[in-house]
Amino acid sequence: MDARFDGRTVLVAGLGVSGRAAAQVLADRGAHVVTFDDRAPEADHRDVAAFLAGDGLAEVDLVVASPGLPPHHPLLAAARERGVPAWSEVELAWQVRVPRDGGGGEAAPWLAVTGTNGKTTTVGMLESILRAAGRRAPAVGNVGTPVVLAAVDPQVDVLAVELSSFQLHLTHSMSPQAAAVLNVAPDHLDWHGSLEAYAADKGRIFERTQVACVYNAADPLTAELVREADVVDGAVAVGFTLGTPAVGQVGLVDDVLVDRGFARLRHTHAAELGTLADLAQLAGPDGAVPPHVVRNALAAAALALAHGVDPVHVRDGLRAFAPGAHRIVTVGRVDGVAYVDDSKATNAHAAAASLAAFGEASVVWVAGGLAKGATFDELVRARRDRLRGVVLIGVDRAPLRDALARHAPDVPVIEVAAGETEPVMTRAVQEARRLAAGAPAGVPVTVLLAPASASMDQFASYAARGDAFAAAVRALGADGVSPRDDGPEATP
């Protein structure tokens, strides 16, 4: 039992994976758990209006809320009005941590990652580096495994924690050993209400950081979030850059990843962490490692170094890292055209990074879905030179169509609407093949699924969307499917 929870009534709002885990951990600690979920038949309460009208919060001591509940949700608004504290599952995890075996009574430290894009890849790289160093280090959080289950496992040495802005919003006391914000670009504005609110929630990850705040030297907003954070005395800021690093940064010298943030002689020397060849398994169809992948590797390296990992283990971990599905994966080739699945590119920032990996006028772009209030002018303006043609899918085709008309009027655009005989993705891939066939002989062409939008309008998840793309490519008679496509990961 835990005196903080024993006999207390805790409302767990949302019975997804993290909500169920929270309910289990709370019950194990003696709490009286009440559940709410308007889509789960087993929930104690499903109608928020009826629950609140019946004064359902009267006996509630704490709300543990799913990341799916926005701040303006009636349940959270009512809890604020009554003064009932609300936590995320991540906050609960921090509160219930247990001492790790062999840790001298200390709980496992957390290495935390957030950002608009690249979180899952970076946390996966970090996990691989930590395991190469002999640490028992699960990747947890938004990547799939609830943080709260790892927090109560004494067999864990260190946690590689992926956190979304949703999770951070109701996280109040977490004190990570090191934390990183990879980038900040407009996303989930329907949930947060504004870019400023979204960025502020991302920045919460740096609060109370103990050793190092890792930021993107090419993204001034991430550096600003470090400056605004209240950290533990002695914590340092470490930037990552694709250029030659200054003191206090990790970066790239020719094809070598180097450290000038933690190395003992960093004022005069850089310590080698690995080379781009150690990331060869992440190369795109042209054989080059995409810039955003290198940034992710540098961020993961910085977090691992903050934990005390040796540079040789950074190299070994990056070499061993196996990328997840739906992240710039070549799923087949038809008539010399590569078909690449980057269904995980669920916003404009991610799609821009994906398109940047390809050459001029070489991409037939399959895009569209649920826009979440986003605009696409900046994306199209920045990447129009990559486009040979565009196939639009999804319910929110209009914002992309209009941006293309304004900034890339010469690029042919085909729209595929739902409700016809064949599945949307089958027709999209067929149209993309026709556009690709118009390229001059000898010109390399890639059909790229990088939707810049969420998937839930027409697919169960970004993974289901990517699977549908791969299936449609196979139906064309693709002559090879990438062995990297090893199954879907958790939703972002």
Language model features with spans:
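Glycine-rich, highly charged phosphate/nucleotide-binding loops
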Residues: A43-G56
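Nucleotide phosphate-binding/pyrophosphate-handling subdomain across enzymes
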Residues: D2-V10, A21-R29, L279-L387, D402
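Beta-strand->loop->alpha-helix junctions that form or flank phosphate-binding loops
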Residues: D37, W87-L92, P138-G141, V231-L252, ...
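Conserved beta-strand positions in the Rossmann-like core of class I SAM-dependent methyltransferases
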Residues: V34, P138, V391
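C-terminal helical cap/extension that packs against the catalytic core
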Residues: H45, D377-V445, R484-P492
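Phosphate-binding loop of NTP-binding sites
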Residues: A27, G54-A58, P67-V236, Q430, ...
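Residue-level signal for inorganic ion chemistry
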Residues: G14, L26, V63, V113, ...
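NAD(P)-binding Rossmann-fold cofactor-contacting core
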Residues: R29-D44
